[in-house]
Amino acid sequence: MDELDSAILRLLQRDARQTNRAIARTLGIAPSTCLERIRALRARGVITGFHTAIDPAALNRHVQALIHFQIRPLSRSVIEAFKTYAVGLPEVSTVYVVTGGDDMIVHVSAPSVDYLHGFLMDKFTARREVVGFRTSVIYQHTHNQVLPPLTA
């Protein structure tokens, strides 16, 4: 990946709705060059899709939390089955398989703390593979809008 690819990615990460011509104009390159670079980035799997950023509160998701799970027995099939179950729940946005004291972290959102409590009790306490979990309510979050490539 060269500097031109990195510049294209920066612009697309800030606003994926930009036209090819607008990106080319900003970078001072021909639109055909820009289009070919974007196609190549997609073909190489660098660009995996274009997404819309949504305010969770606008979807009645006022409370967000990270649920830290301990799973047993710890096997690929059990982890995969639980991951499939969790990601199928409408309250779940992301499932992470992690190392350390927890086996999985699940990012959820809910209309209220009461709803969150009921969701946890109804969806996870009866699952045999869940030997324990703890909840961290998210007060605020920030993320980088642009992820630049890192050098080794």
What does each model-found stretch correspond to?
Residues 1-152:
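A compositional/biophysical signature of low hydrophobicity enriched in polar/charged and small residues
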